A protein has these predicted regions:
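Conserved structural motif at the start of ABC-family nucleotide-binding domains
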Residues: 22-24, 37
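The feature captures the beta-strand-to-loop junction immediately N-terminal to the Walker
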Residues: 53-55
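Helix-to-loop junction immediately C-terminal to a conserved catalytic motif
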Residues: 68
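Conserved ABC ATPase "signature" region
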Residues: 110, 118-134
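Catalytic Walker B motif of ABC-type/P-loop ATPase nucleotide-binding domains
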Residues: 162-166
Length: 247
């Protein structure tokens, strides 16, 4: 019997890909009797990249805020990888990330760096090609620069679960490419992703599967393979067809 050392190493580093990092069960939320989230259930396995796609106001950000503990809910439950006393296992980019405008981008990262070394900061700055402006004050940054800094913060301490709300907003095509590659690389190392967008085509190249959300409800989960079968169609029309069938 031949032992595959590479397989054993990958298992020890990443696990077998079946470990549940996040499990959401029948989650519901209301505000003043208005349904925000309705009976949502799904799970994320280790190393997987899952998209969350829907129109503006469909419930994407609300769901992410509940999972991150920024918002309450009335029914259901969820379990996620536990926070370690000395390590943050969850990284997040949510709308309007809290950046310190009168500090440099580098100093913003230093505040949140768990390592005694600046190596992790320099690595993420290189990966996102932020070197030219990382030492400038954040108040001078464009929208795209701030977005990349928010993404850098989410990735900084190599969390096991990374939740990204509309990460491609404000990014030029080169930056989108860099972020996609970073996501794919981190997933290979074992990080798990939940990534939202209102544009299906933004995510299809990197996600293992995509959850379609409409009016606070998950109406369908589609795999990358299923979407690739529709590659001759406009993916946004595919998304609209899925939503229309539910109405």
């Amino acid at each position: 019997y031949e032992i595959n050392i590479d397989s054993i190493f990958n298992y020890l580093i990443k696990g077998d890909g079946n470990m549940s990092i996040l499990s959401v069960n029948h989650l519901s939320k209301k505000i003043n009797n208005k349904i925000i989230l309705k009976n949502i259930s799904f799970s994320l396995n280790e190393g997987h990249i899952v998209g969350l796609v829907g129109a503006n106001g469909a419930g994407k950000t609300s769901l992410m805020k509940v999972i991150l503990g920024y918002s309450d809910y009335q029914e259901g439950n969820f379990t996620s990888i536990r926070q370690d006393e000395n390590h943050c296992n969850i990284g997040a980019l949510i709308e309007n990330p809290g950046l310190y405008p009168f500090m440099s981008g580098y100093d913003n990262l230093k505040l949140l760096n768990e390592s005694n070394s600046t190596g992790p900061i320099n690595k993420i700055v290189d990966d996102l090609k932020m070197n030219k402006y990382i030492h400038n004050k954040v108040k001078t940054y464009s929208l795209g620069m701030k977005q990349k800094l928010g993404i850098a913060i989410a990735f900084l301490n190599s969390p096991k679960l990374i939740i990204l709300d509309e990460p491609m907003n404000g990014l030029d095509p080169k930056a989108v490419r860099d972020v996609r590659q970073l996501i794919l690389n981190k997933a290979k190392e074992g990080s798990t992703f939940l990534i939202s967008s209102h544009i299906l085509s933004e995510l299809v190249k990197i996600t293992d599967s995509t959850l379609i959300i409409d009016k606070g409800k998950i109406i369908q989960e589609v795999t990358r393979e299923e979407l690739e079968q529709d590659e001759e169609q406009d993916l946004e029309n595919v998304l609209l067809d899925i939503i229309d069938k539910e109405e």
